[in-house]
Design a protein with these regions (language model features):
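A hydrophobic alpha-helix adjacent to the NAD(P)-binding/active-site core of NAD(P)-dependent oxidoreductases
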Residues: 1
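Hinge/beta->alpha junction and helix N-cap segments in small-molecule ligand-binding domains
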Residues: 89-90
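C-terminal effector-binding regulatory domain of bacterial HTH transcription factors
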Residues: 110-144
């Protein structure tokens, strides 16, 4: 699933980075990221805000097919986050990881933007697939 997300969201980042209204679009992404930072404390709320950030990235392309394709994956994305366990989910939803994506988009270079999303997804997949979990987490799924 992360390969598909990397392709889809990488395309979205590349499109957004080449838009003439880039500054305004980056500001919208930053607001969405600020919401993620404010969501700390409620893991379920964090998941929804994280998904909203990624959906927004797709929406900012103005490409309805891209958005609908992302929406078709949203349930599977949510499930993978919820079953990863709290510690892994929080790591993947970290503000610095998302800020790197925004910063890459803000360069206006589609290749840089796409690469940042690829890295974000690669790290998220590695984290979810790792056997390392804290004693507190014990890989317990997040119950909504």
């Amino acid at each position: 699933m992360f390969e598909v997300r990397a392709a889809l969201e990488g395309l979205a980042a590349a499109i957004v980075s080449a838009r003439p209204d880039l500054v305004a679009l980056v500001a919208k992404l930053q607001i969405a990221l600020d919401a993620l930072e404010s969501a700390r404390g409620s893991i379920n709320h964090m998941v929804e805000v994280d998904l909203a950030f990624h959906r927004l990235l797709c929406e900012l392309t103005g490409n309805i097919t891209l958005v609908r394709t992302w929406e078709a994956l949203a349930g599977s994305i949510r499930m993978s986050i919820m079953f990863a366990g709290t510690d892994k989910a929080i790591t993947n939803m970290s503000v610095p990881r998302h800020q790197q994506v925004i910063d890459a988009i803000a360069t206006g270079d589609p290749a840089v933007a796409r690469d940042a999303v690829d890295q974000h997804m690669r790290e998220a997949a590695q984290n979810l697939l790792s056997d390392q979990s804290s004693e507190d987490d014990a890989s317990e799924p997040i119950i909504a």
